[in-house]
Regions:
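Catalytic P-loop NTPase motifs of RecA-like helicase/translocase cores
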Residues: 10
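A generic structural signal for short
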Residues: 35-36, 184
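Active-site metal-binding loops of divalent metal-dependent hydrolases
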Residues: 5-6
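A short alpha/beta connector and helix-capping loop motif
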Residues: 1-2
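Acidic, polar loop-rich interaction surfaces within structured domains
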Residues: 14-32, 38-159
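Long, acidic serine/threonine- and proline-rich intrinsically disordered regions
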Residues: 139-302
Length: 302
């Protein structure tokens, strides 16, 4: 766990990440790196890139009294690992079905993507944590809803105690579903990620155009209350971009943390999702006189 309250003014995020990658190459170690940015003077690009490198979480800490809560969330997760280096594999079962994009793919520890195949490694698969992958696929004009189109395989554990599960999936149609909202969320944060890069390159007109195009796309393709929170998020992001002082002091860090947590969902950075995390945060808050959160329903992986 790495906490920083200092800035790297030389913008060496890629060099630092590459250095850590070379340092750990050849070590037969399964470890996750969690990074914590505190205050206003630290570099969120470096902190998030280092976390991405080892499949960890990047935490933006805005209040001092939240530091122990974030550390507990990360530490409780490290103490609740079910599998080291679990693998997720997705392949298409039809020649004319293609995998076009995995949202947030650049934030994965590793991946292999082809038209008909996707594979990634989860360095530490944590009890109670939900992993959500949003995938954009290309389908033919005519397709049967009864056809199995994808096969998903999850592999975890050592060779002598390997857990292996294979599921096949069809197209699901109908009313607005969880999948629709996940796709909308992924599209929004993918756009915010692009807009952040444009802002850092001082391409403000292109940045504004990109975000406003996304607002128009949402209004055109989505109806009802579900879209409002994403329109609000885009407007909040535009507000953080407009004032350079706000952007430099906290906007960049907040936007980076939002992108990291939502573009590729790995359970959330501030969600106590298993018994260990709940017990540790309850004990911490009892000792400090703060109110403890309600226990979260927890289902043990059999």
């Amino acid at each position: 766990m790495l906490l920083s309250d200092g800035n790297d003014n030389d913008y060496n995020d890629i060099e630092i990440a590459d250095g850590l990658k070379k340092l750990t190459k050849g070590f037969n170690l399964s470890f996750t790196l969690h990074t914590f940015g505190y205050g206003e003077d630290y570099d969120p690009k470096i902190m998030s890139r280092l976390a991405n490198l080892r499949d960890g979480s990047f935490y933006m800490i805005e209040q001092l009294d939240k530091v122990q809560d974030y550390f507990i969330n990360a530490l409780g997760g490290c103490m609740s690992v079910i599998y080291n280096e679990a693998k997720l594999k997705i392949k298409t079962l039809k020649n004319n079905v293609k995998i076009k994009k995995i949202f947030g793919m650049d934030k994965l520890y590793n991946y292999n993507l082809k038209d008909d195949y996707f594979e990634t490694t989860l360095l530490q698969y944590i009890s109670g944590k939900e992993y959500t992958f949003t995938i954009e696929v290309e389908l033919p004009n005519v397709i049967s809803i009864n056809d199995n189109l994808f096969e998903v395989e999850f592999i975890g554990g050592e060779d002598n105690q390997k857990f292996n599960q294979i599921c096949q999936y069809k197209i699901v149609g109908g009313a607005f579903s969880v999948a629709d909202e996940e796709y909308l969320k992924s599209k929004v944060y993918d756009t915010i990620d692009i807009a952040l890069k444009l802002k850092e390159e001082n391409k403000n007109d292109e940045m504004n155009k990109k975000l406003n195009e996304m607002k128009n796309w949402i209004n055109k393709n989505y109806e009802g209350i579900n879209k409002n929170k994403y329109l609000k998020k885009i407007n909040e992001t535009l507000g953080l971009f407009q004032d350079n002082y706000i952007f430099e002091s906290r906007g960049r860090s907040k936007i980076t943390a939002d992108i990291y947590e939502n573009q590729l969902r790995r359970g959330g950075n501030f969600v106590y999702s298993n018994h260990m995390q709940c017990a540790m945060i309850n004990q911490s808050k009892t000792n400090s006189g703060r109110s403890a959160p309600n226990p979260i329903p927890y289902f043990c992986n059999k």
